[in-house]
Amino acid sequence: MSKHRIGLIGGTGLYNIEGFTNQKWVKVKTPFGLPSDDLLTGKLAGRDVVFLPRHGRGHRILPTELNHRANIWAMKKLGVQWIISVSAVGSLQEKYQPCDIVVIDQFLDRTKQSATHTFFGRGIVAHVAFAEPISGELRRILVHTSLAAGANV
């Protein structure tokens, strides 16, 4: 298994993680402002983990108000190499039931509705490949671990 430092971004309803030890809340300043909340560092199953409640503790930030750049920058600043983002969502497909786990391999980036959807600009020009935005290795680990835990994946 990889030794990458893991970042967890919790969506609606995920504010605490069972088994998270050595917890310490850390305030991280970024060039893009403050992230949604302080970041919680600690250990989970022996791994270094950084947790961020996406909407802030108390669910006080609307999805359209999220500072995605600050959230990602803060994770990177704390040494995170992989981010697992958890969301409570629905589906129009009946094959997916409540509590099923869906591990995506592609997504539609709707943050482009915002004027601040990139880390570049102000004299910095870059083109980032987006054909495979999900790490294949991380996806395999998530699927394997979820199935081993008895989840419907």
Residue ranges and their predicted role:
Residues 1-130:
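Metabolite-binding pocket within alpha/beta catalytic cores that recognizes anionic/polar moieties
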